[in-house]
Amino acid sequence: MKKLILIITMVVSTLIMQGCEKGMDLQPQDYFDGQQLDIAKAIYDGDRPQLDKQLSSVNKEILNRPAKEEMTLLFWAINNAIYDKTTPERLKIITDLVKAGADPLQPQPNTPGSPAEFVMKADKGIWIQAMLEGGLSPNARDKVHNQPIIFESFDAANTETLKILIAYKADVNIKGAMNRTPLINALYNSCPEHIEVLLAHGANPLAKDDFNDSFLSLISAEIDKGDKSNA
């Protein structure tokens, strides 16, 4: 069963990244029971009034407790806000859950990172925007590597999630592992469009990492290599 869930999750992940319009109809009772099942059913039905009633009496422990196959209610809400279910009301359900205490940075074993990291890799910014509306900080860091979630945008097919974070006042010079900035990471990930967006919004090309390298010095070194190879 775990292998099946992993396969389904991988397919869902791929389709979210591609912005597809139709998905698998997973059922709430396949994963949840008790109070979590009531919440999951409201999410599945897209019933925000009913969800509000459930959330008014739920504690954060229940809201964030992994159910069968490590499924969480927030990831369940994401699954129910994709394909033809990508509606404003269903995106607001994601916002409602985060406002109520669902943790978008909670590591999710069956997906590439936490819900926030997962949706940062998508080719649309609507899911991360829903979390930001719920209170997620645009400068949030993952709980495993302490890496700013802005770096996850470099795995996306375009700059949509990056632009959303910036619109919500993300620090474009925030430093991650080895004190590398988003600009340096975008360079190492060969993301010219992301670099253009970062520079247009004030990213500092002179900021140095632990190796005393800056974006500008790395670019200059690459130009020098090219000049020498052409000599």
What annotation goes with each model-predicted range?
Residues 55-62, 93-103, 129-137, 163-171, ...:
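Ankyrin repeat domain, specifically the short helix-to-loop turn at the C-terminus of the second helix
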Residues 50, 89, 93, 126-127, ...:
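Conserved ankyrin/ankyrin-like repeat signature
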Residues 31-39, 64-81, 107-118, 141-150, ...:
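Ankyrin-repeat boundary/"N-cap" motif
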Residues 24-32:
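TPR-adjacent "capping" and linker segments in tetratricopeptide-repeat scaffold/adaptor proteins
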Residues 18-19:
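C-terminal motif of bacterial Sec signal peptides marking the signal peptidase cleavage site
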Residues 41-46, 76-89, 118-124, 152-158, ...:
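Ankyrin repeat A-helix N-terminal signature
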Residues 1-4:
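Positively charged n-region of N-terminal signal peptides that target proteins for export
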Residues 7-15:
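Bacterial N-terminal signal peptides
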